[in-house]
Regions:
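Generic helix N-cap/helix-start motif at coil->alpha-helix transitions
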Residues: 2-12, 39-45
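Preference for intrinsically disordered or flexible, low-complexity segments
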Residues: 17, 22, 26-35, 43-50, ...
């Protein structure tokens, strides 16, 4: 007899498949996941493995199945083998993101403020995108020689080999000035921004991102866009912006099909941007 956890999972899975992972279906799966995580019932944990797997929390799915799975069962052993490969190669890094509510976005801003993270107009959430990482022990910034608990991990183009930069030295422009460096190639940006100060802010005072090829920055409404993160088609659907990013004269029909087939962390990678003025979402894409 099918238990209630499995019945609910099948309903949510069907909704997720039929809507191609739209924001409501992803949010419903996350709510279900969070409830199951508080439940000690073995049947709930068995279904939680399926939810983790569907949302691409591969490491979490593997770890939990290792704990509760019957290793005398051939199906369980086969699934463990498949999940192990994904867990080792992907971890939970490419999990489908939970669409954030306005309240959650505000809490994230408050957390960044508590950490003392400067505001970057063109890269508003650099901790979430991975441009910065946190260190409990602290790391010495190469530029100011002060200990920082948040340090830069994305590209910095300079003659000298710089390992660690703190957010303050990036925001002030001191890192770019001291090392005659930049965080973004000034030729790899969209046209249409006439204000040289905006270009200076982008390349000298904004954390960059890591692309497969040369990183490229989108622009709209006469200004550079905010970089929101790394995405594939599933993430674009989860954010509810897939159709919006396809409505872009940058891409021909063949390229639009490629965007719809892109996979975060895969051979064809997309990068999500948003206009600071009208709110339109745009992507850049490249290959490994």
């Amino acid at each position: 007899m099918m238990n209630e956890y499995l019945k609910q999972y099948i309903t949510l899975q069907k909704q997720f498949r039929e809507t191609k992972g739209n924001p409501d279906s992803v949010r419903a799966l996350y709510d279900f996941k969070e409830g199951l995580e508080q439940n000690e019932d073995k049947q709930a944990k068995e279904v939680l493995v399926d939810v983790y797997d569907l949302l691409d929390y591969k490491k979490s799915a593997y770890d939990l199945l290792c704990q509760i799975g019957d290793r005398s069962d051939k199906k369980t052993l086969k699934r463990l083998g498949t999940l192990k490969e994904y867990a080792e190669n992907w971890g939970n890094h490419y999990a489908i993101p939970k669409p954030k509510t306005p309240e959650e976005k505000q809490k994230e801003k408050e957390r960044q403020a508590q950490l003392g993270l400067p505001t970057f107009r063109y890269h508003p959430d650099p901790l979430d995108t991975g441009a910065f990482e946190e260190s409990e022990e602290g790391i010495v910034c190469d530029c100011c020689s002060k200990t920082t608990h948040i340090y830069y991990t994305a590209p910095f183009f300079s003659v000298e080999d710089i390992e660690h930069l703190c957010p303050e030295c990036i925001a002030s422009g001191e890192a770019a000035r001291k090392y005659s460096g930049s965080f973004q190639d000034d030729y790899s940006v969209d046209d249409g921004v006439d204000d040289p100060e905006k270009l200076d802010e982008l390349i000298h005072r904004t954390p960059g991102y890591s692309g497969w090829q040369q990183e490229y920055w989108r622009a709209h409404c006469g200004d550079y866009c905010a970089f929101l993160g790394y995405v594939g088609a599933r993430e674009l659907r989860a954010h509810g912006v897939l159709e919006e990013v396809l409505d872009d004269p940058m891409w021909d029909e063949e390229q639009k099909e490629m965007i719809q087939e892109s996979v975060n962390g895969g051979h064809l990678q997309c990068y999500l941007f948003q206009c600071l003025h009208c709110g339109k979402h745009l992507v850049w894409m490249d290959f490994d």
